[in-house]
From Swiss-Prot:
Pfam families: Flavodoxin_2 (PF02525). It is an enzyme of class 1 (oxidoreductase). GO terms for molecular function: electron transfer activity; FMN binding; oxidoreductase activity, acting on NAD(P)H as acceptor; oxidoreductase activity, acting on NAD(P)H, quinone or similar compound as acceptor. InterPro entries: Flavodoxin_fold, Flavoprotein-like_sf, FMN-dep_NADH:Q_OxRdtase_AzoR1, NADH:quinone_OxRdtase_FMN_depd. Its cofactor is FMN. This is FMN-dependent NADH:quinone oxidoreductase. Binds 1 FMN per subunit. Belongs to the azoreductase type 1 family. Its EC number is 1.6.5.-, 1.7.1.17. It catalyses: 2 a quinone + NADH + H(+) = 2 a 1,4-benzosemiquinone + NAD(+); N,N-dimethyl-1,4-phenylenediamine + anthranilate + 2 NAD(+) = 2-(4-dimethylaminophenyl)diazenylbenzoate + 2 NADH + 2 H(+). It comes from Geotalea uraniireducens (strain Rf4) (Geobacter uraniireducens). FMN binds at S17, C18, S19, S148, S149, G150, G151. Homodimer. Quinone reductase that provides resistance to thiol-specific stress caused by electrophilic quinones.
Length: 210
């Protein structure tokens, strides 16, 4: 029995979102194929994600200098503990699905905040004399990114969404990465349903092997 962490970052209702609607079709097929697996849902707009702020940096700095977690201020403990909670949840999963829209050639800031919360030295990566090393190379972990954009950007230099997520997953040791991209729905609106339909078919195929 595997644990799937399903992370969404979209303000639209599912029926009005290309990425969420494709994600739902993926999840329906995945659960049909893997009914015993555990799925954990994280909505980055709804759920409170702790950003890295002055208290977090101060707390981390104190602990690097040998101070205990118990010696941190109340705010430092609360905020660092919140980040650790998300990092531990991420580590506990075997599979990851991120469902996002494109915002200005990237993705919403809430996803970057979440990535900062799970990329924690000593938990998901470590520094070595030869460079950083991902600590999540075990368990055959895999990641799927379901992403949508109004224009055509995937595979181009200006795309800072899918390539970044693939890179940061690899940074933590998760090398098995796949993407499903719905694009062009605003650029060619009369073909939007065709674009979404193709993505749904791909999502169902990926779900059967994920």
């Amino acid at each position: 029995m595997a644990k799937l962490l399903y992370v969404t970052c979209n303000l639209k209702p599912t029926e009005f979102s290309c990425s969420l609607s494709v994600g739902k079709k993926f999840l329906d097929e995945y659960l049909r194929q893997n009914p015993a697996d555990e799925v954990y849902f994280l909505d980055l707009y709804r759920d409170n994600i702790q950003r890295i702020d002055a208290d977090v940096l101060s707390g981390w700095g104190k602990m690097r200098n040998g101070e205990s977690f118990a010696s941190l201020t109340t705010d430092e403990q609360r905020k660092v503990g919140h980040i650790w909670k998300h990092a531990d949840q991420f580590i506990a999963a075997d599979k990851y699905v991120f469902v996002t829209p494109m915002f200005n050639l990237g993705f919403p800031a809430e996803l970057k905040m979440y990535i900062d919360a799970v990329c924690v030295v000593g938990k998901t990566f470590a520094y070595t004399p030869t460079g950083p090393v991902g600590l999540l190379k075990d368990q055959g972990r895999k990641c799927l990114h379901i992403h949508s954009s109004g224009g055509f950007h995937f595979g181009k230099e200006e795309d800072h969404s899918v390539p970044y997520l693939k890179s940061i997953m690899g940074f933590m040791g998760i090398e098995d990465f796949e993407s499903i991209v719905v694009e062009g729905v605003d650029a060619i609106p009369d073909r939007a349903e065709s674009f979404k339909g193709a993505a749904v078919e791909k999502a169902r195929g990926v779900a059967s092997q994920f």
